[in-house]
Curated annotation (Swiss-Prot):
Protein encoded by which gene: groEL
PANTHER family documented for this protein: 60 KDA HEAT SHOCK PROTEIN, MITOCHONDRIAL (PTHR45633)
Localization per Swiss-Prot or TrEMBL: Cytoplasm
Protein name: Chaperonin GroEL
Source organism of the structure: Mycobacterium gordonae
UniProt similarity note: Belongs to the chaperonin (HSP60) family.
Length: 120
């Protein structure tokens, strides 16, 4: 039963990460697994579970502040292409995404669909 609870927790972490960020599910899953493993190890060694929870919450707050303070807006077509290329692992895809975003604007919507036709 504990394994199922853990698996459901990790599934929920991955789903929430995908819903909010659209990326980073592997990182979120690895972090969740490490938090559970180390949390259980500390509780087994006598740590207070509520103290651990408070410590994790403080760490999350600090990390969030640090990330937000170092974040940079992506504004130019070149920045979009570079960022999308890194995310996709392919600069040509990054260039296509930047071109599509340039055409639809900041408030536009881009829909990507799978195709059975090669090259289209």
């Amino acid at each position: 039963p504990y394994e199922k609870i853990g698996a459901e927790l990790v599934k929920e972490v991955a789903k929430k990460t995908d819903d909010v960020a659209g990326d980073g599910t592997t990182t979120a899953t690895v972090l969740a697994q490490a938090l559970v493993k180390e949390g259980l190890r500390n509780v087994a060694a006598g740590a207070n579970p509520l103290g651990l929870k408070r410590g994790i919450e403080k760490a999350v707050e600090k990390i969030t502040q640090t990330l937000l303070s170092s974040a940079k807006d992506v504004e130019t077509k070149e920045q979009i292409a570079a960022t999308a290329g890194i995310s996709a692992g392919d600069q040509s895809i990054g260039d296509l995404i930047a071109e599509a975003m340039d055409k639809v604007g900041n408030e536009g919507v881009i829909t990507v669909e799978e195709s059975n036709t090669f090259g289209l």
